[in-house]
Amino acid sequence: MMENYKHTTVLLDEAVNGLNIRPDGIYIDGTFGRGGHSRLILSQLGEEGRLLAIDRDPQAIAVAKTIDDPRFSIIHGPFSALGEYVAERDLIGKIDGILLDLGVSSPQLDDAERGFSFMRDGPLDMRMDPTRGQSAAEWLQTAEEADIAWVLKTYGEERFAKRIARAIVERNREQPMTRTKELAEVVAAATPVKDKFKHPATRTFQAVRIWVNSELEEIEQALKSSLNVLAPGGRLSIISFHSLEDRIVKRFMRENSRGPQVPAGLPMTEEQLKKLGGRQLRALGKLMPGEEEVAENPRARSSVLRIAERTNA
């Protein structure tokens, strides 16, 4: 049964304003969540406008199905497949804006049964879509120690990754972990130096969650697809919550804002240069939440909004 967990949408107005909504435009909300961005987009669309929302969380889909609006449709699936969804609807090159609000949502964190939080004891799951793939518990019980250490180091930037991985494997040999509290306790015991501002399990939980949900690969694929589906002048409005996400978004926007890089002195005709094409995006900058928003919603503190526009190239 789905509880009514409160969710405060971060950078709500800024992210939607970044789309530069046209009343008759076609937009994608790739991370519906609890519908904060979608509802604001719908309020700015005219009768001819359309909004396609995507989410892989069944609880988000249940919320989306309560929206009775002919301009709105919801897809249960990963946003990495947005290119397929757009192609199926014959909308390639016709999308006027894509919004992505990355990472885990407050309702997912606050619901102990989802297994995302070390602050609330629940099943060690962490899947955005609990109907697909391996849970965190299943992966940790079958993965090699070296693989766990790599994930913790790469996706959690955890400096004690090897020690924690060893402790996880040893604990699972004795008795397989199935609860978030068990993992949090194992990590805390294996961490020799504690950060007084951060729970010792913070980085491990982030890393395992990112790995279980292939989050960074999802982002990279969605960004790649966006170039094909956006209309000239179409906008990308993307909110990230940690450096790994933001690094991917920043690099993508920077690289596609430069156009093809031709080595100095390489002899090329004007025709050859035309075939290489020009830049595909124009980066429009970044925004961060103000002090007032952070005070009202501490989880907004680390968020970064980046906006870019598709060029005619």
From Swiss-Prot:
Keywords annotated in UniProt: Cytoplasm, Methyltransferase, rRNA processing, S-adenosyl-L-methionine, Transferase
Gene3D superfamilies attached to this UniProt entry: Putative methyltransferase TM0872, insert domain, Vaccinia Virus protein VP39
Localisation: Cytoplasm
Any one GO BP annotation for this protein: rRNA base methylation
Pfam families in the record: Methyltransf_5 (PF01795)
Sequence positions that bind S-adenosyl-L-methionine: G35, G36, H37, D55, F79, D101, Q108
Primary location recorded for the protein, binned into one broad class: cytoplasm
GO-annotated cellular components: cytoplasm; cytosol
UniProt EC number: 2.1.1.199
Domain of life: Bacteria
Reaction it catalyzes: cytidine(1402) in 16S rRNA + S-adenosyl-L-methionine = N(4)-methylcytidine(1402) in 16S rRNA + S-adenosyl-L-homocysteine + H(+)
GO MF entry, a single one: protein homodimerization activity
InterPro entries listed in its UniProt record: RsmH, SAM-dep_MeTrfase_MraW_recog, SAM-dependent_MTases_sf
Record-stated family: Belongs to the methyltransferase superfamily. RsmH family.
HAMAP family with a match to the protein in the record: 16SrRNA_methyltr_H (MF_01007)
Function: Specifically methylates the N4 position of cytidine in position 1402 (C1402) of 16S rRNA. In vitro, active on the assembled 30S subunit, but not naked 16S rRNA or 70S ribosomes.
Name the record gives this protein: Ribosomal RNA small subunit methyltransferase H
